[in-house]
Amino acid sequence: MRILTGYLPATSGSVHLCGLPVATRPDEVKRRIGYLPENNPLPEDMRVSEYLYFRGRLKEVSRRQLGPRIDEVLEICDLKRVRHRIIGQLSKGYRQRVGIAEAILAEPPVIIMDEPTIGLDPHQILIVRDLIAGLRGRMTVIISSHILPEIEVTCDRVLIINQGRVVAQGTPAELRREIFGQSSYELEVAGDPSTVDAALATVDPDLRAAPLGETPAAGPEEFRRLRLTTARSDELGDAIVAALAAAGCRVRAIGREHPSLEDVFLAATRRSWDAVQATAPRPTPAR
């Protein structure tokens, strides 16, 4: 993140933000980004409005525009009630919102946030999550985080980096398809097994059913739990239920299984490690 924001030079490779090379034009890049570091060094003795005015002048926002802009970011970040409070007396959640207000103060086209919800309680996480979502359409927000459930509900596009290399990228749905390559459903159904298989084949000839857990021997009237897998990515739940009902089978429950972003991350990084090990030179045995 420090390389992206121009605070640390890269030893190899290159970074461009807003079409500008960070390495050779860092000052121009910094004017186009707002940055919320993981440990935001806020001044403990300044009031919220004083700090935003101070930062706004450093960002070269004109005095005429700065007052209305401070009012606007205080409204966006729900900070009006604490605008005259000393920053050192604020909770971590409020301090994080002050950091976001400072980052968006000069209306940069790009906002970079490093672990924006770490250390917050669940209520504060929801507030910050909604705040970030409210920036959508106004500016590009880049978030670095290891809290993958937050990334999944906040971000439109995900990049997974392992050992400095991008090993997967795309929307969460695209990553699931790329990494796992199939959709799966959990089904509870009662009916003759051959009838169930025939009904499923009418929905998708490649739909495969496997028993879930320890399924005891049961007659056609007993419910069985099955995992269905298919290469198709479209939603098949309604079609499966309709086909089974038409065949005289009884469905008690059906649900589509969605691998979490944590599952995707683990699979993608494991795949990249396997690729590295496969291409690594093997040591010559001693003679």
Which positions does each model-derived feature cover?
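ABC transporter nucleotide-binding domains
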Residues: 1-163, 167-168
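Short, surface-exposed acidic/glycine-rich loop or hinge patches that mediate macromolecular interfaces
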Residues: 20-23, 84, 166, 190, ...
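Non-catalytic alpha-helical coupling and interface elements of nucleotide-dependent molecular machines
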Residues: 57-60, 180, 184, 205, ...
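Short glycine-rich hinge loops at helix-strand junctions in the catalytic core
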Residues: 78, 204, 248
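ABC transporter nucleotide-binding domain
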Residues: 129-231
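C-terminal coupling/interaction segments
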Residues: 232-287
